[in-house]
């Protein structure tokens, strides 16, 4: 039997996941993080993107996170997300439209602030599309 730890993924709206997992993958402020059982204690910001959850027995779940905080303690990991949406609940058409609008905004941006905001929106749309794609593959 694989080693596991307890994971809680919570957004401002609801608890998205609570259970035993073998590992997770998430994008922290310093890059990609893989959290396995026995990981050293850690507190870090999460960038917009996805969390890949490998549950007990190897089943995978993908959740889009708009950002938040990751806390790793012995035996338990907590993700406090600004917004969290399960892959199957994301709307592909809306994500594609958001991506298109962000790309247009980047092309027509005037100034660093406009460009930075449009780039952030583009990154969020691309992350949502990636979560949708991986969720479809996992089903």
Swiss-Prot record:
Keywords for the protein's UniProt record, in alphabetical order: ATP synthesis, Cell inner membrane, Cell membrane, CF(1), Hydrogen ion transport, Ion transport, Membrane, Transport
Superkingdom of origin: Bacteria
ATP-binding found in the keyword field: no
Gene3D superfamilies: ATP synthase delta/epsilon subunit, C-terminal domain, F0F1 ATP synthase delta/epsilon subunit, N-terminal
Gene Ontology MF: a single term: proton-transporting ATP synthase activity, rotational mechanism
Pfam assignment, any one: ATP-synt_DE_N
Membrane topology listed for this record: Peripheral membrane protein
Gene Ontology cellular component terms for the protein in this record: plasma membrane; proton-transporting ATP synthase complex
Subcellular locations according to the entry: Cell inner membrane
HAMAP family named in the record: ATP_synth_epsil_bac
Job description of the protein: Produces ATP from ADP in the presence of a proton gradient across the membrane.
Family designation: Belongs to the ATPase epsilon chain family.
Subunit structure: F-type ATPases have 2 components, CF(1) - the catalytic core - and CF(0) - the membrane proton channel. CF(1) has five subunits: alpha(3), beta(3), gamma(1), delta(1), epsilon(1). CF(0) has three main subunits: a, b and c.
Protein name in UniProt: ATP synthase epsilon chain
Organism: Salmonella arizonae (strain ATCC BAA-731 / CDC346-86 / RSK2980)
């Amino acid at each position: 039997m694989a080693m596991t730890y307890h994971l809680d993924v919570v957004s401002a709206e609801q608890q998205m996941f609570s259970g035993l997992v073998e590992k997770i993958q998430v994008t922290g402020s310093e890059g990609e993080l893989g959290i396995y059982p026995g990981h050293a204690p850690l507190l870090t910001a999460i960038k917009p993107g996805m969390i890949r959850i490998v549950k007990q027995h190897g089943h995978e779940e993908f959740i889009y996170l708009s950002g938040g905080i990751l806390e790793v303690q012995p035996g338990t990991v907590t993700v406090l997300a600004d917004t969290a949406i399960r892959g199957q609940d994301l709307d592909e058409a809306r994500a594609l439209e958001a991506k298109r609008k962000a790309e247009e905004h980047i092309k027509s941006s005037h100034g660093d602030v406009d460009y930075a905001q449009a780039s952030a929106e583009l990154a969020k749309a691309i992350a949502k599309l990636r979560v949708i794609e991986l969720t479809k593959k996992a089903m």
